[in-house]
C-alpha cells in the first residue's frame, strides 16, 4: 500500500498570526479527482481536530478507508468524477504537517512548547498557500468540519472573493464557554500527568494517563445523552470483564470510553493536542466585526452556502450553525440551512453518513 500523502513546502519563513515564524514548514495533503483545464472545480476540505488528510481511499494508492470514506469518491456525495478534492492535514497537527511534534530545524529536537502560538488563521493561511501553489485562483467549494469549519471561516475572512461556495458542517463562529471549559480540562489532564514534564516527554515516559483522560472528556462531548442512553442504558459488564480493583469499570459505557481512549493515546501527539485545542478556543469571528459575530460574518462573501448542524450537538450547539447561516445570508449568500436530529451529537457528520450525504450531495449537485 503506497502513501497517498503529498507535501507542500510553505514559504520560509512562514509568519504566524500571534507572533513568531516557522522555518522550513510543510503541509501534508491528499487529492482525488482531476483539476479541470480552467481550474474551476476544486473543493478544499479542512478537517476537525485529529483527522489526517486521508479523507478517503485511493484505488491506485492508499486503499485504506479514510475518515470520510462514505462521503467522498466516484458517484458519492462529494463526487470525485466531477470535483478535484483536496484535503489538508492542519498546520500544527502530527499527521505529516509541521507542528509541535516536528523537529525544530534550529535544534533537531521536537519543537514541543517552543512551537509558536498557533491560530486557526495560520491553519487557513497554510491551506491557502497550497491552493495557490496548485494553480487555483478560486475554490469552487470550501468545506469545513468541526474545527475545520472555523478554519474555513478564517480562510474566507482572510481571502475575500476566493471561494465560490461554502459548506459548513457542525461548527461555530466562536467557541462558547462550555467548549472552552471542556478543552481546558483536557489540557489540564495532560499537563498534570507526571510524564508530561513540561513538554519534555519521551516514548518511554509518555503522558498516557493524561491523554486517555483528555480523550474520554472529548468523546463525552462528541456524542449525546440520547445516544448514551440508547446504546448503553445501565448495562453492566460481565464479571470477567471487570478489573479486580475498587471503583474500577463496572458499566459498559465506562468500558467504551476506555476503549476509545486507548485507541487514541499514541495516535495523537500531546503537544499538538494542546496547541490545536487552544487555537480553537481563540478563534472568534467577532474579532473581524468590531466585537460582533454578525458583523464579522458580513465580511464573508460567497455565492452559495450550505450550513449543517445537529440538534444533539452540545459542543457546537445548533444555534451557532443558525447564526452562521443568518450571517452569510445577510452578507448576500444564497443559504441552505439543514438541521438534523441525528442522535450521535457532534460526531454525527462522521457517523450519520446517509443524512449528511443527502444534504451535501444535494447541494453540490446544484453548483
Curated annotation (Swiss-Prot):
Top EC class for this record: transferase
GO MF assignments: homoserine O-acetyltransferase activity; homoserine O-succinyltransferase activity; L-serine O-succinyltransferase activity
Site (Important for acyl-CoA specificity) location in chain: 183
This enzyme's EC code(s): 2.3.1.-, 2.3.1.46
Active-site annotation: 146 (nucleophile), 313, 346
Renumbered residue ranges of the record's region Important for substrate specificity: 48-51
Protein keywords: Acyltransferase, Amino-acid biosynthesis, Cysteine biosynthesis, Cytoplasm, Transferase
Catalysis performed (reactions): succinyl-CoA + L-serine = O-succinyl-L-serine + CoA; L-homoserine + succinyl-CoA = O-succinyl-L-homoserine + CoA
Binding-site list for substrate: 215, 347
A single BP term in Gene Ontology: homoserine metabolic process
GO CC annotation terms, alphabetical: cytoplasm
Residue ranges of every copy of the AB hydrolase-1 domain listed in the record: 41-351
Pathway terms, separated by semicolons: Amino-acid biosynthesis; L-cysteine biosynthesis; L-cysteine from L-serine: step 1/2
Major subcellular location class: cytoplasm
InterPro entries recorded: AB_hydrolase_1, AB_hydrolase_fold, HAT_MetX-like
Subcellular location: Cytoplasm
One Pfam entry name: Abhydrolase_1
Function: Transfers a succinyl group from succinyl-CoA to L-serine, forming succinyl-L-serine. In vitro, also has homoserine succinyl transferase activity.
HAMAP family attached to this UniProt entry: MetX_acyltransf (MF_00296)
Subunit description: Homodimer.
Record family assignment: Belongs to the AB hydrolase superfamily. MetX family.
Name of the protein described by the UniProt record: Serine O-succinyltransferase
Organism: Frateuria aurantia (strain ATCC 33424 / DSM 6220 / KCTC 2777 / LMG 1558 / NBRC 3245 / NCIMB 13370)
